[in-house]
Amino acid sequence: MAVPKRRVSKTRAAKRRTHYKIKLVKPVKDKDGTWKLPHHVNPTTGEYK
């Protein structure tokens, strides 16, 4: 079993964790001017984008 040779400092661990974040989904504007999430069907037009 792997055992760390040295203790990882709080700062070093926090720097590594800066990339563990949620990416925000940007809404897309449809042809009819309504905003919707990408990869979802527009209920009014039935368009999938």
UniProtKB/Swiss-Prot annotation:
A Pfam family that the UniProt record links to this protein: Ribosomal_L32p
Protein name, as recorded: Large ribosomal subunit protein bL32
MF GO annotations: structural constituent of ribosome
Keyword Cell cycle: no
Organism of provenance: Nitratiruptor sp. (strain SB155-2)
Keyword line: Ribonucleoprotein, Ribosomal protein
Any GO BP: translation
HAMAP family assigned to the protein according to its UniProt record, in alphabetical order: Ribosomal_bL32 (MF_00340)
Entry GO terms, CC: large ribosomal subunit
Family, per entry: Belongs to the bacterial ribosomal protein bL32 family.
